[in-house]
Design a protein with these regions (language model features):
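Conserved, structured core segments of small domains
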Residues: 1-118
Length: 118
């Protein structure tokens, strides 16, 4: 079985940990990567798309309606945010009083990203 693990936390809390503890936690991430886990994190900026009336509307914040459960996910490759908005505007959740939250993905397995964080 594979699991999608949605991790919640803040950069502020991460940075408040002692460096030794951060290193230990990053070592655990490396163990997961060696086991073949696909690991990623979302950037803090978010775009929510709604097309309730057939026309895409966007907001630069998460979908506030907590009564709507997570129904699914997709990883979409696109040239830019406008292309993604156009692609998801016609999906069931965007049209049926739900929303699609769009966040750029940072691939943690990418060596360039790991070098950037050092």
């Amino acid at each position: 079985m594979k699991f999608l693990c949605l991790a919640y936390g803040t950069e502020k809390d991460w940075r408040s940990l002692p460096r030794a503890e951060q290193d230990a936690l990053l070592a655990q991430d490396e163990i997961l990567r060696q086991r073949g886990a696909l690991m990623g994190a979302v950037e803090p900026n978010v775009t929510t798309v709604q097309a309730w009336n057939g026309k895409p509307e966007t907001a630069k914040e998460p979908f506030p309606q907590l009564s709507a459960p997570l129904a699914g996910f997709a990883i979409i490759e696109a040239e830019n945010l406008d292309e993604v908005v156009a692609l998801v505007a016609e999906t069931p959740c965007a049209r049926a009083k739900g929303a699609i939250e769009v966040r750029p993905i940072m691939i943690l397995n990418d060596k360039e990203w790991r070098n950037f964080k050092k």
